Each structure stands twice: as C-alpha cells, then as structure tokens.
Amino acid sequence: MWRGLSALVTRPASAPLRLCARCSTGAESLVPGSTIFALSSGQGRCAIAVIRTSGPASGLALRSLTALREPPPARSACLRLLRHPCSGEPLDRSLVLWFPGPQSFTGEDCMELHVHGGPAVVSGVLQALGSVPGLRPAKAGEFTRRAFAHGKLSLTEVEGLADLIHAETEAQRRQALRQLDGELSQLCQGWAKTLTKALAHVEAYIDFGEDDNLEEGVLEQVDRDVRALEVALSSHLRDARRGQRLRSGANVVVAGPPNAGKSSLVNLLSQKPVSIVSPEPGTTRDILETPVDLAGFPVLLSDTAGLREGAGAVEQEGVRRARQRLEQADIILGMLDASDLASSSSCSFLDTVVAPLVAQSHDSGRQRLLLLLNKSDLLSANAPASSTALPPHLLLSCHTGAGMDALLQALKTELAAVCGDPSTGPPLLTRARHQYHLQGCLDALGRFQLTTDLALAAEALRQARRQLSHLTGGGGTEEILDLIFQDFCVGK
C-alpha cells in the first residue's frame, strides 16, 4: 500500500468512574474521533465471549467499566470486576487486555474484555459500553477496515482474513492463511518494484538521453525486465481459475446411464442421503447439488439424471440439464454398471460422453474424467469386467464400499490438479478482482511493447503499476471496498 486521549480527572480506585450519556462530564469534547465496540466472538451461549473496542475513547471505556486509574500493562491480561458506568451495578468479572495504538490490530487504541458467554452478560456489557460518551456499535467489518486504513493490512490480506473466517476445508484454510500472511501482496509489491525501476529508467532516458553519463543498454534492460514480467503475469493468469475453484469449490459431476449407481455414490461421498436411491431407472430427474469436503478440497458435488434416449418429456428435460452440467464440470465421475457394460445405454455413454472426454483430456494435458465401473460385487471372481477395451477406470462397489479408498485417492490427485496445492508454489489468485487487475496490468505492458514513443511507453508503465496498486488496495474506490468489507461479521 502506496492517539491519543487527553488526561482525564479520575475518581479514587474504590469508586467506579460514572460516565454515561445522562451524566454531565463534558467528556465528549475530549474524544476527537469515533470509537467502536462489538462482540467479536460468536453469537449465542458459550463459555467465553470476547468484546472489543477500537478508537481514541478505548481508554475512557476501560476506566469507566473497571475504575482503573490507568490502563493495565500493554498486551497483558488482568482480572477486573466490570461495573455499569452509570449505576455502578456489577456486570461480570472479566479478563481485561489493553492494546495501545499503533501496536494493535487496527492501529488504534484497543481494548478487549473476555467475559462469561451468557447472553445476559454480553448484553449487559454491550449496553454499558454504549453508555460511555464517544462509543458507538461497530458496523460489519469496521475493525478490519480500520486496520486497512491504518496500513496494518493490505487489501489482499483483508481478503485472506475473510477467506480464513469462512474456510470450511483444509485446502481453503491453507490458501487463506498464505494470503493473510501477505504472500500475494508481497508478490505484487515485487512486480511493482520491477515496474518502478523500468519507469525510472525510461524517464531518465527521456530527460538525459543525450547525456554521456547515462549507461548504455538502459532501454534494452527495461525491455528484458518487462518481457520477463509479462511471462510471470501470464503464468499466474493461467492459474487464476484454480485459485477461484479453491475458494468457491470445484464442480464435480456424477454422470452415467440410468441405474449405474450415481445416486448411491453421491450419498457415499457426501455421507448423507442427498439423493433417492431406487432400483427403478430414471429416479433422479433433476440436478441435485451438495457441498462436500473431499480430501480437504471444497467440492460442489452434483447428481444428474441417467443419460438415455426415449424417456418421457420430464426425464428428457433432466437429461438435457445433465448434459449442460457436464459442460460446466471441472471433474466428471463417469459411472457404468460393471455387470451390464454391453447394454445400449452403456455403449451410448461410452461413445457420446467418455470417448470425447478422453480425447479432450489428451489434448489439454489434464484429465477431467474418472471412469468408474460400479457394482463390482456382482462380477464373478474370475470374470473380467468387460471384453471390450475401456479407457483407464476404477472398479467400485457402492454396496460393499470396495474401491472407495482408490477412488478418494484418485479424486485427491485430480482436485489438486484443478485447484492447485495451497501448500506449495506461488500464491493463487482467488478472486475475479485479482484476475481483472492482473489482466489490466498485462494489457498495459502489451501497449508498452507496441509503442515506439518513449512518453507513451512511460505512461503504459504507469498504468501497469496503477493496476497492481489497485490489486493490493492502493487507490481503490469506496464502492469496491464496501463490497469486500461486507463479507465480515460485525465484530471483525
């Protein structure tokens, strides 16, 4: 990304400092800015609740509720009895922590009260804080927004914090933590330094091009640096979809002819009865979706109608939707009945779905299909699954669970390929906003390469650097910032 409170007259420690909206203290004039407070831990009954404040009146709030003459030692917990500032009524015994700015999460004076988590206790403490002059309830994400405004977090780190709060799988947690730790921000800063150096050299050549003291090959070095940066940006843009899948979930679609066991597999993978299982063909007639954690990766698992011709109008609409969903899938689990591979529906699925997908995976260098032969328990011990040549496949029995471990391992490999491994490699682009600004930077570098006018070349470099600045939060519009901070709860 391109404190203070005046002295207050305190009462003796034995008596609580009584400051509230209806107490005549004149303390409002001592508070230069707004101070916010909120419950930071989860709603509902719990063992411990954390209530925090941020702003110049945090010290006043601390003294008002605890009767302390001075704040306790910074970042050290002390046990105090909390009293209402107006009535002096005891509220709870609390651990009190004091974080003076700028060495705090928001960069402002902050206080945390760790109280018992009963709803009445939390409500009473929040009401007491609301009676202190200069304090108001925080808005959603306002603590984090203040941290951003004071340079404690870049915008990509803010997004990483939001993703960490909402992470539901191990892969999401790892990716969010890397982004919160600033890896994406640091990568962008490195690119920005390259552009700044290139821009300085171009402008130096414009100003001192005829000067003998200017080193030779300055523009040639700029050109090499910009081309190397273009390669790096292009590589990250190619991986952008992987990061978005990791954040939102990969689309895994189960498809196949009727009665192949698709619904049984969906129920097994999701570990809950998502789909109705019946021996009658055509039971599933619409797309059934469920979010699943598979091998630590977020997945949107879809059950689809059995693919066959000649069914009724309603089932044919389900087949049409199933084929449409196949086009949107990241990974397709193609299911066949291992005991009925010679049927017309199985042969049709192999010809119309499996064969094109196998050819496509060879062309793209990435496998998108896992072919599964279900009902392996119905095969005799010495009989092959089929006399016909099949693409690589896995034998599976949803009835006995045989082959599930091999399927989960294969899925883990495929998910790592389409989502990326959050533990290794460069940080991923997890949002469309990241992709937009990186593409804008790359477009500006393309204009730099095409122009022969040094002034236009310098302007192209400025535009490229500006796009990187927007990515990390520099010069961002209020509308975009509002959307990002709306993802946070009130106490964050």
From Swiss-Prot:
Homodimer; forms a dimer in the presence of potassium. Interacts with MTO1; forms the GTPBP3-MTO1 complex composed of homodimers of GTPBP3 and MTO1. Residues 1-20 form a transit peptide. HAMAP family: GTPase_MnmE. SUPFAM superfamilies: P-loop containing nucleoside triphosphate hydrolases, TrmE connector domain. This is 5-taurinomethyluridine-[tRNA] synthase subunit GTPB3, mitochondrial. Transmembrane segments: none annotated. PANTHER family: TRNA MODIFICATION GTPASE GTPBP3, TRNA MODIFICATION GTPASE GTPBP3, MITOCHONDRIAL. GTP binds at residues 256-263, 282-286, 303-306, 374-377. Keywords: GTP-binding, Hydrolase, Magnesium, Metal-binding, Mitochondrion, Nucleotide-binding, Potassium, Transit peptide, tRNA processing. Its main location: mitochondrion. Forms a homodimer in the presence of potassium. The keyword Mitochondrion applies.
